[in-house]
Design a protein with these regions (language model features):
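Conserved ATPase-coupling elements of RecA-like P-loop NTPase cores
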Residues: 180-182, 199-213, 236-237
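Conserved helix/coil segment N-terminal to the catalytic DExD/H
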Residues: 156-191
Length: 264
């Protein structure tokens, strides 16, 4: 196996190329010096399929992504690189890194990489009111000057008007989601949801959880990343609603809260 940084491709020499070409439509057969090779784009989706076929293909993001410097000055920490790469490889994922570990930039680096590789289009960041401007909007402005962001804040009419702007990153507080829920039905271009401080949706009986669940799981196919440094602030049972929000099809999580409660 060879990784071509120039072509951003995985090159395989196979006795039976159809083993790969029949399951990966983007794979192509090439002839190089009399050798039959298969070239596959080195992207997250193709990498996952190749791994399922038994090939030990490395994550593409660390190899091919040109990381913008944080605040225009600092390289990512190793933990941030690992986190960003992990998120890029999972359409539904949790980031449970502690406070001060740079989760915000890690998520934005991962989004930026997926956007550049045309895996996703736009992202909606759902976060506490206190972090909309000074954390998320500032991070986009300072580290990703090539991205546009808008903070959806104010009256319902104002939020809906701001949502119509053609930008890369939309930022809204969790309690403001109700004002744009219906409008998001027709926004298939917003195909990634980042829920910052996911533990705010730890109770499936609240309007917060129900609205988030509608946006994440009932409107269109969307990637969802849940971020929190304290997933179970009150009890282990806090995890159930968060799991059902981000990974509703996870068979390891009981369908009903009572069954989960009895386990933990």
């Amino acid at each position: 196996m060879l990784i071509s940084k120039e072509k951003k491709a995985v090159i395989l020499r196979l006795k039976n190329p159809s083993r790969v070409t029949t399951v990966i439509p983007t794979a192509v057969e090439v002839n190089h010096n009399g050798q039959r090779l298969v070239a596959i784009p080195h992207r997250p989706d193709e990498t996952r399929v190749l791994r399922n076929l038994g090939f030990e293909v490395p994550d593409p993001m660390p190899i091919h992504y040109n990381w913008p410097k944080a605040n225009g000055r600092f390289n990512p920490f190793d933990a941030q690189r690992e986190t960003a790469s992990f998120l890029s490889m999972h359409s539904r994922a949790f980031c449970l890194n502690g406070m001060g570990t740079g989760k915000t930039n890690a998520a934005l680096w991962s989004y930026d990489y997926l956007r550049r590789t045309k895996v996703v289009n736009k992202v909606l960041v759902v976060c506490p009111l206190s972090t909309m401007e000074r954390t998320w909007a500032d991070s986009v402005f300072n580290t990703f000057p090539h991205l546009d962001a808008v903070v959806l804040h104010g009256t319902k009419d104002k939020r809906l008007k701001l949502l119509k702007q053609d930008v890369h990153v939309y930022i809204i507080n969790i309690d403001g989601l109700a004002t744009i829920r219906d409008a998001l039905k027709d926004r298939d271009d917003i195909d990634l949801i980042v829920v910052d401080e996911l533990a705010l949706a730890r109770n499936s009986g609240t309007d917060r959880w129900k609205i988030l669940n509608t946006i994440c799981n009932k409107q269109s196919v969307r990637r969802v990343w849940g971020m929190t440094g304290s997933p179970t602030p009150n009890a282990p049972t806090d995890a159930w609603a968060q799991c059902k929000l981000v990974t509703p099809d996870n068979s390891a999580v009981p369908k009903y809260f009572s069954a989960f409660r009895d386990r933990v």
